[in-house]
Curated annotation (Swiss-Prot):
UniProt keywords, alphabetically: Antiport, Chloroplast, Hydrogen ion transport, Ion transport, Membrane, Plastid, Plastid inner membrane, Potassium, Potassium transport, Transmembrane, Transmembrane helix, Transport
Role summary: Contributes to K(+)/H(+) antiport activity by supporting proton efflux to control proton extrusion and homeostasis in chloroplasts in a light-dependent manner to modulate photosynthesis. Prevents excessive induction of non-photochemical quenching (NPQ) under continuous-light conditions. Indirectly promotes efficient inorganic carbon uptake into chloroplasts.
One example of a Gene Ontology biological process annotation: potassium ion transport
TM helices/strands, residue ranges: 7-27, 106-126, 189-209
Protein name (Swiss-Prot/TrEMBL): Potassium/proton antiporter CemA
Gene behind the chain: cemA
Catalytic reaction list: K(+)(in) + H(+)(out) = K(+)(out) + H(+)(in)
UniProt record similarity statement: Belongs to the CemA family.
Subcellular location: Plastid, Chloroplast inner membrane
GO MF, any single term: proton transmembrane transporter activity
């Protein structure tokens, strides 16, 4: 009975890891035709955020430059000018399609994220017993590791999250979050988060090491500081 209970959290953990990805993929595939049809037929207003508006304006500026070029080369043969106008028309249609596709992807990503969050919340509420067993299993696994491996793992994790090269990773993650939810990418806000969030994490880590690890395993703290130096 104990062995069976110990194995129960493993399928639970696998479902937590793979279920959101599977739902995201199936949800996008099944809902994309419906969202595309709804956006193209029922959408009466065009609402852009600052980034999308900037991209659209840049695209139309390029088209305007092509029109000016068209005016400058009117002495060219009519067939050449006609081909140029057809090309500009195709580029305009492509620009509108890209704009619509961006909105469709934002709607799909936002809906998928909300669905995955709801499923994970239901898992955490309904699977309380599995979470307790999983927590005890993780604690037992960490307890059996040597202090050197623990210190090395903590050092590796902290370097990845708050190390010298971490701001680039934080910029990518925050930018991806903004893009998935369709928010306006404010460079000042992103820069502020990148400069302050790692500092907050570093402070929390030092507090945890001082108040928890120093009490539970002083040798681990000594090894950690030795590796860090």
């Amino acid at each position: 009975m104990t062995k069976k209970k110990a194995l129960n959290p493993l399928p639970y953990l696998a479902s937590i890891v793979f279920l959101p990805w599977g739902i995201s993929l199936s949800f996008n595939k099944s809902m994309e035709p419906w969202v595309t049809n709804w956006w193209n037929t029922s959408q009466s207003e065009t609402f852009l955020n600052d980034i999308q508006e900037k991209n659209i304006l840049e695209g139309f500026i390029k088209l305007e430059e092509l029109f000016l070029l068209d005016e400058m080369i009117k002495e060219y043969p009519e067939t050449h000018i006609q081909k140029l106008r057809i090309g500009i028309h195709k580029e305009t249609i492509q620009l509108v399609r890209m704009h619509n596709q961006d909105h469709i992807h934002i709607i799909l990503h936002f809906s998928t994220n909300i669905t995955c969050f709801a499923i994970l919340s239901a898992y955490s509420i309904l699977g309380n017993e599995e979470l307790i067993t999983l927590n005890s299993w993780v604690q037992e696994f960490l307890y059996n590791l040597s202090d050197t491996i623990k210190a090395f793992s903590i050092l590796l994790l902290t370097d990845l999250c708050i190390g010298f090269h971490s701001p680039h990773a934080w910029e990518l993650m925050i930018g991806s979050f903004y893009k998935d939810f369709g928010f306006v990418q404010n460079e000042k806000i992103i820069s502020g988060l990148v400069s302050t969030f790692p500092v907050i994490l570093d402070t929390i880590l030092k507090y945890w090491i001082f108040h928890y690890l120093n009490r539970v395993s002083p040798s681990l703290v000594v090894i950690y500081h030795s590796l860090n130096e």
